[in-house]
């Protein structure tokens, strides 16, 4: 075990933590006895499904194609959950298994270990998903819940197999995810009614206040608060000025597969365009002007540019793309129907 890392642990917790870590290392060693190249490749693919690489496309697909309100709920839940996880990681500053036993590392993560973001995010996504799908297909309740729980456990297994999390990291992620669900998902309908009763002004103010609080509490990452603000403001503006209904009829017909494909194509193309173009223009390592002192990675405008970029990404998802769908005839346009 890496003695340098151990010496960094709080003295009063050293005995408990070192014992806990040693137990976790032994568990991982047992799991890694089944290691082989094919299984490792499969595990790395599955573990990638526990990240934004899966959640973002699924949430946007729900928002743009199935149910915009449901997409909003999933989006806010995942954004806030990810922010809380990042905050807790930096607060606890716990090592990963490969920090203590390098031979265990079959993948690399630059962030701290506990609580596991993969465990937390999978719980926060698949449990609400199961609750929703159960209402859509009540006769398939057992299959839906079994599949969701299986996927949560499968994601957790991949983190142990790759040596990037201790079992206790996973437990912490599940506990934190459960708390997030209890605070946001369970009272969700009541929160929505309260915000709706206060009108658009209350919704704008609430989004701004929550964003300020997120930035004030945790200053190391501005991207998640920015996405939250853009996503919420965009949704409020959309419902106020040009209501978008994902399943509304277009010229008397329900949107079909072609419309779905074109919405996803234009929506994701716009998302990538905004992200990449602003990354090239705004300060930072990816900027075209990074060689200049004022616009390089150490630029005083870096955080502001990053906030604007991610804010516009969130705004595009909930307002920009839906409005484009309407203008392209890919969604019903209330403005056109009034003419």
Model regions and ranges:
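N-terminal transmembrane-helix/juxtamembrane module of multi-pass inner/ER membrane proteins
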Residues: 1-54, 85-111, 242-243, 250, ...
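Helix-coil boundary and interhelical linker segments in multi-pass alpha-helical membrane proteins
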Residues: 2-6, 68-70, 163, 167
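Residue-level detector of alpha-helix boundaries and kinks
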Residues: 12, 31, 72-73, 214-215
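Generic structural signal for well-ordered secondary structure
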Residues: 20, 39, 54, 68, ...
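Charged, low-complexity surface patches
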Residues: 35, 77, 219
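Membrane-embedded catalytic cores of phosphoryl/pyrophosphoryl-handling enzymes
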Residues: 42-43, 58-65, 82, 97-265, ...
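Residue-level signal for the membrane-embedded core of alpha-helical transmembrane segments
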Residues: 50-53, 75, 79, 120, ...
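Membrane helical hairpin/interfacial module
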Residues: 62-95
């Amino acid at each position: 075990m890496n003695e340098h890392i151990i010496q960094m642990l709080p003295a009063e917790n050293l005995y408990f933590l070192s014992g806990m870590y040693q137990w976790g290392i032994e568990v991982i060693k047992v799991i890694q006895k089944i290691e082989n190249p094919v299984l490792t490749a499969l595990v790395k693919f599955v573990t990638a499904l526990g990240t934004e690489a899966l959640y973002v496309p699924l949430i946007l697909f729900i928002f743009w194609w199935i149910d915009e309100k449901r997409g909003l709920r999933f989006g806010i839940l995942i954004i806030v959950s990810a922010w809380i996880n990042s905050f807790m990681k930096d607060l606890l500053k716990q090592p990963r298994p490969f920090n203590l036993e390098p031979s265990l590392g079959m993948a690399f993560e630059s962030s701290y270990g506990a609580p596991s973001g993969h465990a937390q995010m999978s719980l926060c996504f698949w449990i609400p998903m199961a609750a929703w799908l159960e209402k859509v297909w009540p006769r398939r309740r057992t299959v839906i819940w079994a599949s969701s729980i299986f996927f949560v456990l499968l994601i957790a297994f991949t983190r142990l197999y790759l040596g990037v999390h201790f079992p206790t990291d996973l437990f912490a992620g599940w506990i934190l995810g459960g708390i997030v669900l209890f605070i946001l998902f369970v009272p969700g309908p009541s929160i929505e009614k309260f915000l709706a009763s206060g009108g658009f002004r209350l919704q704008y103010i609430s989004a701004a206040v929550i964003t300020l609080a997120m930035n004030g509490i945790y200053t190391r990452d501005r991207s998640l608060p920015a996405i939250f603000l853009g996503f919420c403001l965009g949704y409020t503006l959309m419902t106020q000025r040009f209501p978008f209904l994902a399943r509304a009829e277009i010229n008397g017909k329900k949107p079909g597969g072609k419309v779905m494909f074109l919405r996803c194509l234009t929506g994701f193309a716009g998302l990538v365009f905004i992200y990449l173009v602003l990354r090239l223009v705004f300060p930072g390592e990816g900027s075209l002007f990074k060689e200049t002192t004022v616009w390089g990675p150490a630029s005083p405008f870096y955080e502001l540019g990053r906030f604007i970029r991610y804010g516009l990404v969130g705004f595009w998802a909930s307002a920009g793309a839906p409005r484009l769908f309407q203008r392209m005839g890919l969604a019903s346009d209330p403005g056109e129907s009034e003419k």
